[in-house]
Amino acid sequence: MAAKDRIQAIKQMVANDKKVTVSNLSGIFQVTEETIRRDLEKLEDEGFLTRTYGGAVLNTAMLTENIHFYKRASSFYEEKQLIARKALPFIDNKTTMAADSSSTVMELLKLLQDRSGLTLLTNSAEAIHVLAQSEIKVVSTGGELNKNTLSLQGRITKEIIRRYHVDIMVMSCKGLDINSGALDSNEAEAEIKKTMIRQATEVALLVDHSKFDRKAFVQLADFSHINYIITDKSPGAEWIAFCKDNNIQLVW
């Protein structure tokens, strides 16, 4: 097995089991313990895990970022479908839109497959695949594929996005904090979303109820950039008042 494939397999094991041991990995991959230690050191440099005596543990801040797209898509699945249906009216009069690679936004895109006259700019490899036979005109951002999140990232991605302007950008995030704004755990993905936000007239944030009052590693956007927050249930009186005071349309 090539080193890059072994490291990818180790990442998946850490994501699934939350911790691994050097001796166990050495036996599984039939390489020396020193080779495994070097692999774990590389993953620690990425911020994916923390090495411990005899092994390593998953960094919890990286958990949702590195679990595979399809595994994340199954979490809060009914809530995501509900949010997608509630978001549909905000796309009705739009002809151009940008979409991130989140599983929540993917549910909205599935509902738009028969929509003619709509152009979609996205860095989601899953969206490009699912919408290949749809009525939507799909514009890919290009870039380097993150095989876990199924998103396209990097310098090229941002350069392509800057060529366009869209009526609305739809995205999700890992957390919402009244003081910090919309937060994410993946810095590379956050940079793509920030670029999309700058190229959009309006921004809609699609989040399930678990994301409110939840911290994450990277600030994605402050609330001055958000026009709509669409969720599955009331986030509480404080959030309702906050959105009203900040001219954000809150839908649940």
From Swiss-Prot:
Keywords: DNA-binding, Transcription, Transcription regulation. Transmembrane segments: none annotated. GO terms for molecular function: cis-regulatory region sequence-specific DNA binding; ligand-modulated transcription factor activity. The keyword Ligase does not apply. PROSITE patterns: HTH_DEOR_1, HTH_DEOR_2. Residues 20-39 bind DNA. It comes from the Bacteria. Pfam families: DeoRC, HTH_DeoR. GO terms for biological process: regulation of DNA-templated transcription. Residues 3-58 form the HTH deoR-type domain. This is Uncharacterized HTH-type transcriptional regulator YdjF.
